[in-house]
Curated annotation (Swiss-Prot):
Role this protein plays: NDH shuttles electrons from NAD(P)H:plastoquinone, via FMN and iron-sulfur (Fe-S) centers, to quinones in the photosynthetic chain and possibly in a chloroplast respiratory chain. The immediate electron acceptor for the enzyme in this species is believed to be plastoquinone. Couples the redox reaction to proton translocation, and thus conserves the redox energy in a proton gradient.
PANTHER family to which the protein is assigned, alphabetical: NAD(P)H-QUINONE OXIDOREDUCTASE SUBUNIT 6, CHLOROPLASTIC (PTHR48479:SF1)
Record keywords: Chloroplast, Membrane, NAD, NADP, Plastid, Plastoquinone, Quinone, Thylakoid, Translocase, Transmembrane, Transmembrane helix, Transport
Protein name, UniProt field: NAD(P)H-quinone oxidoreductase subunit 6, chloroplastic
Length: 180
């Protein structure tokens, strides 16, 4: 989707806010079911960002694979877990939290330093005309489809069988029934 710069910027801000707030919900919510359910809107915001970047195929794959399959699988696995009572006392700050804070803060500061010290004007970005770019994207999508339905057909079928076995195993473990 080719949008003018100001419109793209206006759409970008709510999407990024949705990503940040949704990510915080995923991490900070204490109920694991709510946390798993709040992962869906985060993945949808990521796919909408791909649409703004003119990567329609990647956005569709993001919706189909992550939102449609992985998020449903996560919610399904969480629902099958035994509803164990967690202790009421949860420490607010642990050693692991402190280490994580130090690592994340140092990574953030190093990224900000790199971004600010990079000479962005020296990086030349050449783009093709929209017509040639759309033609290349169409050919790429057709090539991906051809590879997925011919060369990679067997690996995908094996992967689906492995996922099915993992799902049956997770259900068996969650129900804690003996196999007869």
């Amino acid at each position: 989707m080719d949008l003018p710069g100001p419109i793209r910027d206006i759409l970008l801000v709510p999407l990024e806010l949705g990503l940040i707030l949704g990510g915080l919900e995923v991490v900070l919510l204490t109920n694991i079911i709510y946390s798993a359910l709040s992962l869906g809107p985060v993945l949808v915001c990521i796919s909408l960002l791909y649409i703004l970047l003119n990567a329609d195929f990647v956005a569709a794959a993001q919706i189909l694979i992550y939102v449609g399959a992985v998020n449903v699988l996560i919610v399904f696995a969480v629902m099958l877990m035994n509803n164990q009572k967690y202790p009421n006392f949860v420490p607010l700050w642990t050693v692991g939290d402190g280490i994580t804070l130090v690592v994340c803060t140092s990574l953030f500061c190093s990224l900000i330093t790199i971004i600010l010290n990079t000479s962005w004007s020296e990086i030349s970005m050449t783009t093709k005309s929209n017509q040639i770019l759309e033609q290349d994207l169409t050919n790429n999508v057709q090539r991906i489809g051809a590879h997925l339905s011919t060369d990679f057909f067997l690996p995908f079928e094996l992967l689906s069988i492995i996922l099915l076995v993992a799902l049956v195993g997770a259900i068996t473990i969650a129900r804690r029934e003996e196999i007869v």
